[in-house]
Curated annotation (Swiss-Prot):
Pfam families in alphabetical order: Queuosine_synth
GO molecular function: S-adenosylmethionine:tRNA ribosyltransferase-isomerase activity
Protein name: S-adenosylmethionine:tRNA ribosyltransferase-isomerase
Family to which the UniProt record says this protein belongs: Belongs to the QueA family.
First-level EC class: transferase
PANTHER family attached to this UniProt entry: S-ADENOSYLMETHIONINE:TRNA RIBOSYLTRANSFERASE-ISOMERASE
GO cellular component assignments: cytoplasm
Keyword Lipid metabolism: no
Record HAMAP family: QueA (MF_00113)
Gene source species: Vibrio campbellii (strain ATCC BAA-1116)
Length: 350
């Protein structure tokens, strides 16, 4: 298939620049992957879709304030966007400035040059930086960093984004973009889902800035995914096995949860073993033709045209169903992308 097969026209006014006042106030487009049937609703309808005995899997990554503003010691302004924390003192980052810094360059970050870092090495488009401070990278970011809003949210970050561009169940710092399907859940809805008899499990995928990179090839078979760190621990494996044994469904909240679970499944297939815990980088690319191993239902936001994420959804719900759903969403003025509305999709099995 061609990347252009996943194009759709999206008016700018449908790109959500701010979240709804309440997390659960967003709209929910429900789709049956077998019939293609679409039902319009609100996110609280998730409570009707999730059944007793289901396992709802969340990504518990925490978005770090990954954007830093500063300058070279020589004076030129620059912007740093953390891609990954390598250890307590070092990061791998995108650096935007008029002239790429060379190894050995000192940079200063913060409004008053509070911290300095040394350019250690370049790795393709990314730079390795080591901070000269007694504080950890995470402490520095929490003090002077800005929330890394996606490029299509065309505004500076605000104080409210520190809460709203973060799930209520986040636990493990490391993401530079939010797992956005989870932004719609609040504590009350989570309690209601539990009371209904569903169970929860938590994987970790630290979303990288590469999630916003456009696909740069024509044929999707030629695309190579960026690497992201994943954790699928033993308790998740046990919960999945128990859910499947009792006839329940695995409901993945977000494409990052899908990619985490399916990475573990593919790892087990390659090793010829039962499902086992998975810790490490994944470059899994899911597109039409992929056979899902674990996930039965998907909660996901509306994604960018020609992105790997709309390809993932197409593999789950069927290509024609997916493109028809997106056409419906545009015509009915659903809000798109990170702060936008969402879908509940039952997997196409026929």
């Amino acid at each position: 298939m061609q990347v252009s097969d996943f194009h759709f026209d999206l008016p700018d006014e449908l790109i959500a620049r701010y979240p709804q006042p309440e997390r659960t106030a967003s709209r929910l487009l429900q789709m049956d992957g077998n019939t293609g049937e679409l039902i319009d609703g609100t996110f609280s309808d998730v409570l009707e879709q999730v059944q007793a005995g289901d396992l709802v899997v969340f990504n518990n990554t925490r978005v770090i304030p990954a954007r830093l503003f500063g300058r070279k010691e020589s004076g030129g302004k620059l912007e740093v966007l953390v891609e990954r924390m390598l250890n307590e003192k070092s990061i791998l980052a995108h650096v935007r400035c008029s002239k790429s810094p060379k190894p050995g360059t000192t940079i200063l970050v913060g409004e008053n040059d509070e911290y300095s870092a040394q350019m250690v090495a370049r790795h393709d488009a990314l730079f390795e930086l080591k901070f000269n401070s007694d504080k950890t990278v995470l402490e520095i970011l929490e003090e002077i960093g800005h929330m890394p809003l996606p490029p299509y949210i065309d505004r500076p970050d605000e104080d409210a984004d520190k809460e709203r561009y973060q799930t209520v169940y986040n636990q493990k710092p490391g993401a530079v973009a939010a797992p956005t399907a989870g932004l719609h859940f609040d504590d009350v809805l989570l309690e209601k889902i539990t009371a209904k008899g569903a169970e929860f499990a938590y994987v970790t995928l630290h979303v990288g800035a590469g999630t916003f990179q456009p696909v740069k090839v024509d044929d999707i078979d030629d695309h190579h995914m960026h690497a992201e760190y994943v954790e699928v621990p033993q308790d998740v494996v046990d919960a999945i096995n128990a859910t499947k044994a009792r006839g329940g469904r695995v409901v993945a909240v977000g494409t990052t949860s899908v990619r985490s679970l399916e990475s573990a499944a593919q790892d087990a297939l390659k090793k010829g073993t039962e499902l086992v815990p998975f810790f490490g980088d994944t470059e899994i690319f899911i597109y039409p033709g992929y056979e899902y191993q674990l996930v039965d239902c998907l909660i996901t936001n509306f994604h960018l045209p020609e992105s790997t994420l709309i390809m993932l959804v197409s593999a789950f719900a069927g290509y024609e169903n997916t493109m028809n759903a997106y056409k419906h969403a545009v015509e009915n003025k659903y809000r798109f992308f990170s702060y936008g509305d969402s879908m509940f999709i039952k997997k196409k099995t026929a």
